[in-house]
């Protein structure tokens, strides 16, 4: 009887207890950024910051060589095609599985539409304002569409950061909308803002479509399809709508190459981030593109930056800080072993 008492039995040497982890390792395992936080950081550093260079560089290429948006779109799509080599090496179908091929093509079409509208808008309105309208519309539409289609809500802090970022965008673009010039110049400016809005709407809808795609090699497949659809839609228009225009000097070629590389990096990071975090929060964090575009608009393009632009940019940065700080929550992994 006494031998069966748990406190009198000696420890079984054949089943040693697992060694306890050091305190630093336990802290690292118990407290690390969640998937949503990782997604937002990827969207901020890999999506918003590189994308902020795309608008000013596109405008510089247009100023130097009168390079239309159609040629810019074609050049960007060309950077997507080498991804086919990666898919071939992995043995994956280039166009994706047959059962989801329609949605993958639809996402590629929406992505090309968003890019084309963005490149067209930046040629008639300041780069910062075009990015502002596009990101603002994508954020609002993402919040509404996700709430209606996926019933995925947001916390109070998320809503605070989301509405604050939209307020910052209104502060930036509002004065310019109220002072549109009359005549043909005002019409072109209004058309540019309209294109930026449509581009943001297409972006938000495309992100929701991408979240519904679940298959191996999803990201490289849709990246290749975006380039393929963009070329198939743009190359015929190159000979129908206008005579082909090529960059005329080395700086123009450099701008075009930088646009293609930075846009591909931003596309990859945003597509990854939207699978980890709420689409509206991803779009809100992407408002960092607006701040970068305004800085480059002033220092590279030597365009005027109004005081309202500076105030709005500060509000946007503060809102991004709120969203990021709230989502920097710690996620416990594993349970305490007895």
From Swiss-Prot:
Expressed in placenta and testis. Its main location: membrane. One of its GO terms (cellular component) is membrane. It is a multi-pass membrane protein. The keyword Ligase does not apply. Residues 1-25 are annotated as: Disordered. Keywords: Membrane, Repeat, Transmembrane, Transmembrane helix. Residues 49-174, 272-325 form the EamA domain. SUPFAM superfamilies: Multidrug resistance efflux transporter EmrE. Coiled coil: none annotated. It holds the Pfam family EamA. This gene appears to be the source locus of an SVA-mediated retrotransposition event that gave rise to SLC35G3, SLC35G4 and SLC35G5 genes. Belongs to the SLC35G solute transporter family. This is Solute carrier family 35 member G6. It comes from Homo sapiens.
